[in-house]
Amino acid sequence: SAASDVYKRQIEYCQKEIVEKYGFQKISHIIEGGAERYHSVYCGLKAIKGADYVLIHDGARPFLDEEIIKRNIQAVREYQACVAGMPVKDTIKISDEEEFAAATPDRSKLWMIQTPQTFSYELIYQAYRVLITSEENTAEPEQTLPYDSLLNKQKVKKLQENRGQVHVTDDAMVVELLTDIPVKLVRGSYQNIKITTPEDLKIAEALCEKKQ
């Protein structure tokens, strides 16, 4: 199909123009992604074999450092699920539909969530498997959804009832939606920025110059 040809060309480009060109040694596989970020994550999870833990990281966050990785690995061994983040610096307002301030949450309890987001492999794989399966069918959950002891059966059923209405924005949310495992917050870094806008790129360039 045309879509398959596009994916094939993209994978070949990544292999030749990025991995081989720059001599990266730690890339074991380049995996075809999906329509949304979380679909791509699931594709990656299915390709992993024999892992105890998995760190899921945004490629748009190039300033990840070794200490953040170490803190994540230490935490996941104890808690099964953790995410990097930092306390917010600004006051946050919740907006209503007309962009008036509806509420002001306690800033001392708010964190900006980053990546990596780190989990026991079996936990995050089973949670994602149910999430993706729930999107792909319209039958009753008892008949169709895979169930694992790591998951909360009532939450699984609720997901199926609300299919199409759940908007997943990070990996921890999948664990929160479908399990009773609390997600530990681990210190990231204010420099662990996500490059999304032209302004972010300018900040990233300044950070690169500082590190040189």
Where do the protein language model's features map onto the residues?
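Conserved core of the sugar-phosphate nucleotidyltransferase
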Residues: 64-186
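Hydrophobic helical membrane-anchoring modules
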Residues: 191-212
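Conserved donor sugar-nucleotide recognition element shared by glycan-biosynthetic enzymes
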Residues: 37-41
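Active-site nucleotide-sugar/metal-binding loop of Leloir-type enzymes
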Residues: 42-53
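Conserved donor nucleotide-binding strand/loop of the catalytic core
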Residues: 23-35
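Acidic donor-binding segment of Leloir-type glycosyltransferases
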Residues: 11-26
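Residue-level signal for inorganic ion chemistry
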Residues: 44, 57-58, 87, 120, ...
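Short, small-residue-biased leader/transition segments that mark boundaries at the very start
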Residues: 2-7
